[in-house]
Amino acid sequence: MTSDRFFRLDAGYQQYDWGKIGSSSAVAKFAAHSDPSVKIDETKPYAELWMGTHSKLPSVNHETKATLNDILAKNSQELIGEDVINKFKSTNELPFLFKVLSIEKVLSIQAHPDKELGKKLHMEDPKNYPDDNHKPEMAVAITEFEGFCGFKPLEEIADELETIPEFRDVVGDEVANEFIQNYKTGVENSSSACANNKKLLQKVFEKVMTAPCDILEKNADGMAKRANENPSSFKSSDLPELVVRLNRQFPKDVGLFCGCLMLNHCKLQPGQALFLEAKDPHAYICGDIIECMAASDNVVRAGFTPKFKDVKNLVEMLTYRYDPVEKQVMSAEEFPRAGGDGATIMYNPPIAEFSVLETTFKNKTGKATVEGLKGPSIVITTAGEGYISADGQKLKAEPGFVFFIGANVPVELETTDKDFTTYRAFVEA
C-alpha cells in the first residue's frame, strides 16, 4: 500500500567547485546510494544535496517522479496543514530548504539579508538577488567541521592590529589607532558604548573591504609567507596554518583579512550546531553538515569567491555584533513529543521557518516514536539502517534515503543497526 502522506523523495545535488571530490563527499555517497543511476565521478566535486521545493532544484517522488511542489498543491490542506499555509501563504512550497553540504574548499565569506533588505535588494537587482526573502540558516555537523562565524571579540581584533603589521597596513594607521584607543570591553548590548564599538568595527571592516588591490595583495602575500616560514611570529597558534591553507585555495584574497583575522574560527564536533542569523558574516571552511535555511537564495558576498562581491551593501547591512566563538554554538534540547528507545533532540533556532530533529539509537535494537507534527517535514538518514513507519506503511531507511511526512502523521523509527541516525526538518505554525 502506498501513502499520500508518507513517501520517499529523490533529492537533487549541486556540483559547486568547493565540494568534496568523488566518493569522499557525503553528498555523492548519499545521492548514489539512494539512486543507483547516479554514478560517482571521482574527479568531480559534489557539494550540496537539496531537499525541498525550491524552484532551482525541487525534490521528486521516488516512485512517480512528480515534483514535491505538484504533490503539495494537489493536497495542501492535508500535507502542509491549514495553520502553516495561513502563516507562510503558500500551498505548494515549504518555507524551509533542507540540505547536506560536503565542503572541501572554503565557501565565500557572506551574509544574508533580513526580510526588509531582501525585498529592497530583489527590487533593485533581481539578477544577483533572485527572491525577496530572508535567509537565516542553521548548520549541524555530521563530521568534524570548521567555519567562520560572526566577528571576533574586539580585544582580539585590536591585538591583531597591533601585532600583525600586514593587517595594520591594509587598515591604515589612522583607523587602526582609532579602533585600538577607543573600543570598550564589558559594555551592555543596548548601551551607547556598544553602538560606538560597532561603528569602530564597521570602519575597520570597510577599510579592509575597500583597500586598493595592490596594497591588499602585497600584504596578503607577505602575511601568508610569514605564516608559512615563521608561524611563531603570530600570537594565535592556529592562525598561521589557517592563513596558509586558505591562501592556497584563494591566493592573496581579501578573505585572509576579513575572514581569518576578523571572524571567529569555529570548530564543531558531530552533533554540534551553529545558527547564523541574517546580517551576520560567516563562511564554511571544511567538513560535512546538515543545513536548514529559510527558502531563499540571496547571498551578499565579501571574500574567497570569484563571484559578484557587493561590498557597499555588505558594509552597510551587517549587524557588527561581536561575540566569543562559544556564543555562536547552539545547543539542542530533548524533544518532549518523542518516546521509545531512541534519543530524539531538537535544534530549535529563534525563527519561524524551521526546526530540526535528530534521532539516534544507543543500542542495536529498538523503536522510537514521534507524535504527529503540526506541519510538513523532510527526513534524511545519514548513518546506519532501519525502517520508518507512518500512515500505514513501513519503508526501508538507509544512508541518503530521503522521505516526506505530511502534517499530523505519527512516525515510528526502528533500528536494525546501532548507528541508525536520522535528521528531520519541520515547520509548525
UniProtKB/Swiss-Prot annotation:
It holds the Pfam family PMI_typeI_hel. Keywords: Cytoplasm, Isomerase, Metal-binding, Zinc. Binds 1 zinc ion per subunit. Signal peptide: none annotated. PANTHER family: MANNOSE-6-PHOSPHATE ISOMERASE (PTHR10309:SF0). The gene is PMI1. Gene3D superfamilies: Jelly Rolls, Phosphomannose Isomerase, domain 2. This is Mannose-6-phosphate isomerase. The keyword Transmembrane helix does not apply. It is found in: Cytoplasm. Involved in the synthesis of the GDP-mannose and dolichol-phosphate-mannose required for a number of critical mannosyl transfer reactions. GO terms for cellular component: cytosol. InterPro entries: Man6P_Isoase-1, Mannose-6-P_Isomerase, Pmannose_isomerase-type1_CS, PMI_typeI_C, PMI_typeI_cat, PMI_typeI_hel, RmlC-like_jellyroll, RmlC_Cupin_sf. Pathway: Nucleotide-sugar biosynthesis; GDP-alpha-D-mannose biosynthesis; alpha-D-mannose 1-phosphate from D-fructose 6-phosphate: step 1/2. Its EC number is 5.3.1.8. It comes from Candida glabrata (strain ATCC 2001 / BCRC 20586 / JCM 3761 / NBRC 0622 / NRRL Y-65 / CBS 138). The lineage of its organism: Eukaryota, Fungi, Dikarya, Ascomycota, Saccharomycotina. The keyword Zinc applies. Its cofactor is Zn(2+).
